[in-house]
Every structure is written in structure tokens, then in C-alpha cells.
């Protein structure tokens, strides 16, 4: 039985989404249990409360506070110690749940998760990983998507190791290919850090720690050239939000053109099956649920504006991660890559080596997680 702790108060909409999605998820997953964490009086007022309370595989866990989307990391971490977000993560720490899911403030979630669960041995910084649709009809996993704006080559190696474990667990690809996001495929392209990262990833591939494809460009993300794309959080966040903007623009453009006049509306009816398939294939809601990798517990982030369908997808992704032992897979891959990680740390300048394990929570940036 897989038990998931759900921050029922998180997200832009809160219980109206999380409770409906939770009920649908329970109906689709007979071997799953949910701990719904939230303010009892708010949850009790919801129309689905009675069904969920009566459900044999659902339990309400009380939390007196809520982390809002506008709360600073300091407020979320130091003042709201009984928030639904923190209590949900505590369920993982205490062993009552295998994974936590929240649609709340991304920066606060990362800060609280890191404070409560701590990072895995051998990992300096947690990273945010999510999926983007590709031309192969599958998905490309990408990290980091915003947790770390400044990275060393060692961090990118850690991301590659953790991301490979994620893809192996979620997509069931034993040896996922890894691409390093760059401005060109050639090894001579990019800045010094990217070149060093390329050499480090190649060494990791030679030692069997990862399956390194080489450098990839931005268009390769959507071609599906590799199963996993690794980059720093600044680049990843820009790429993610650019793709979101482009997708919305294309959707709005198609809708406007088919609504132009009676003839185009008739054409839309004829083209409906194709348009419907197109929309489904590129529906970002299907890929909702980003993993916070590198922690001593599993945490997944849902998009704050997720609807019921999207939040259910995030629950399903968290369920798959727990069922396929993602945390143990990450630990095993880190242990296997430990000699290379230690060697990479030893090669860092003294000041970088000292600073590597520490990341101020203020450097965590908010990013949508699809």
C-alpha cells in the first residue's frame, strides 16, 4: 500500500481542486492511501468531505495554518510551523507517508522540504525535475527547473545522476540517455563550466554511472533526442516558461483562426478529431507533478493553478515514484557515482568546495511545475 500525504490547502484554488482530485485518485488506485492535511473546519465545509472521511483509505490530518502563494520563505519556514505544507512533509519524515504532494508556493516548499528532510549524502543541492512533451509522443525529463540559479559542473553531475534515477522509476527506462543543454552539440561550445560539466558527464558515462549522449540544444528538448536534459536552474526555468508561453500562443492562435467566420467554424468541425488529438498530446496538465530530487524523502510539486485533472496527475506521478522505489534508486546511483563525485569535489577551487553544500533558501526561485 502506497500512502501519500497531500497538502489539501495548497495551490491557487485549494480544497476545491485537491479534494476532488484525491477522491478520483483513490477510485483509480485501489492500493493507495491518502493523508489529507489541512484546516479541519475548512475541509469539513467542503461538499466532498463526508465521502472522503468515510473512505477506508483516506485520513484527515489537522494543520492550523496555510502557506499562501505570497508568503516569503522566512514566513513559511519560521513562522508557519503548523502549516498544511509542513505537516504534510512531516508525515514523510515520520514514516507515515512515502511521499508528499503540494501545489503551494514553490520556494517555500523547497525550503521547508530541505529543512525538514535534509539532503541525501553526496548531494549538495536539491533540484526540481519535471517532464515536457516531445515529438516522439512521450516526454523529456528536465532538471533543474529553478531551484539553483548558479551551479558548478559537480552540481550538474549530481542532477544527471538523480534525474537518471527519476526517469528509470517513472518512465521505466533502465538506462535513460542524458543530454547536457548547451548552445551547440560540439564539445568545444559553451562556457568553461559547461565544458567541464561535459567532460565530467562523459567520465560518469564511461564508468557506468549515467548514459551520457552529449550536448543537446534547446530544440532537442522537444525532439525527444534524449530522455533527460540537464541544465542549471536559471536556464531551465527560462526554457520551461518560454515553452509554456509558446504553447499558449499557438493554442490561442488556432482558436482565433477557427473562430474567424462561419467557414472557418465549419472547418473546425471537420478538423475536430485532429485538433482534439493535438490538444491532448500537448496538454501540459498530463505532465503535472515535479519531483524535488536530492532529499531524504519524496516530495512532488503540483502547478499552483492545476485543475482537478492536473492535480490527479501529480498524485499519480508521486504514486509511481513511491511504488517504483525512487528514493532507493537515487541513493543507489549516488553511491555508485560516489568516487567520481568525490573526485569532482576535490578538483573544485577551495572556496567553491567550501560553499558547495550550502544554498541559502532565498536562492530558490518559484517555478511552475508541469
Curated annotation (Swiss-Prot):
Gene: plsX
NCBIfam families for this protein: plsX
Enzyme Commission code(s) on record: 2.3.1.274
Protein name: Phosphate acyltransferase
Record has Zinc as a keyword: no
Functional pathway: Lipid metabolism; phospholipid metabolism
Assigned keywords, A-Z: Cytoplasm, Lipid biosynthesis, Lipid metabolism, Phospholipid biosynthesis, Phospholipid metabolism, Transferase
Matching HAMAP family: PlsX (MF_00019)
Catalytic EC class: transferase
Similarity section: Belongs to the PlsX family.
Self-association and partners: Homodimer. Probably interacts with PlsY.
Catalytic activity, as annotated: a fatty acyl-[ACP] + phosphate = an acyl phosphate + holo-[ACP]
Amino acid at each position: 500500500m502506497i500512502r501519500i500525504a497531500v497538502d489539501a490547502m495548497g495551490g491557487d484554488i485549494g480544497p476545491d481542486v485537491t479534494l476532488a482530485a484525491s477522491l478520483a485518485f483513490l477510485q483509480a488506485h485501489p492500493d493507495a492511501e491518502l493523508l489529507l492535511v489541512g484546516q479541519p473546519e475548512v475541509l469539513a465545509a467542503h461538499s466532498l468531505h463526508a465521502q472522503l472521511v468515510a473512505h477506508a483509505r483516506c485520513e484527515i490530518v489537522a494543520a492550523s495554518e496555510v502557506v499562501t502563494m505570497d508568503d516569503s520563505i522566512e514566513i513559511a519556514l519560521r513562522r508557519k510551523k503548523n502549516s498544511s505544507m509542513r505537516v504534510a512533509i512531516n508525515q514523510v519524515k515520520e514514516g507515515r507517508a512515502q511521499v508528499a504532494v503540494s501545489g503551494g508556493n514553490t520556494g517555500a516548499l523547497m525550503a521547508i522540504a530541505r529543512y525538514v528532510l535534509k539532503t541525501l549524502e553526496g548531494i549538495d543541492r536539491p533540484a526540481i525535475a519535471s517532464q515536457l512533451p516531445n515529438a516522439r509522443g512521450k516526454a523529456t525529463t528536465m532538471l533543474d527547473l529553478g531551484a539553483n540559479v548558479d551551479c558548478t559542473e559537480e552540481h550538474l553531475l549530481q542532477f544527471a545522476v538523480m534525474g537518471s534515477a527519476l526517469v528509470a522509476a517513472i518512465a521505466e527506462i533502465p538506462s535513460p540517455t542524458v543530454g547536457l543543454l548547451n548552445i551547440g552539440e560540439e564539445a568545444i561550445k559553451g562556457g568553461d563550466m559547461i565544458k567541464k560539466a561535459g567532460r565530467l558527464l562523459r567520465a560518469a558515462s564511461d564508468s557506468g554511472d549515467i548514459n551520457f549522449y552529449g550536448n543537446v540544444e534547446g530544440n532537442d528538448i522537444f525532439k525527444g533526442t534524449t530522455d533527460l536534459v540537464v541544465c542549471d536552474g536559471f536556464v531551465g526555468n527560462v526554457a520551461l516558461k518560454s515553452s509554456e508561453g509558446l504553447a499558449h500562443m499557438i493554442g490561442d492562435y488556432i482558436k482565433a483562426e477557427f473562430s474567424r467566420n462561419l467557414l472557418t467554424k465549419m472547418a473546425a468541425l471537420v478538423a475536430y478529431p485532429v485538433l482534439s488529438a493535438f490538444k491532448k498530446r500537448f496538454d501540459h496538465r498530463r505532465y503535472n507533478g515535479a519531483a524535488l530530487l536530492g532529499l531524504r524523502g519524496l516530495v512532488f510539486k503540483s502547478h499552483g493553478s492545476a485543475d482537478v485533472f492536473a492535480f490527479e496527475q501529480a498524485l499519480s506521478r508521486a504514486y509511481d515514484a513511491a511504488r517504483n522505489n525512487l528514493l532507493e534508486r537515487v541513493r543507489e546511483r549516488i553511491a555508485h557515482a560516489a568516487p567520481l563525485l568525490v573526485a569532482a569535489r576535490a578538483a573544485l577551487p577551495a572556496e567553491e568546495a567550501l560553499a558547495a553544500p550550502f544554498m541559502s533558501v532565498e536562492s530558490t526561485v518559484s517555478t511552475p511545475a508541469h
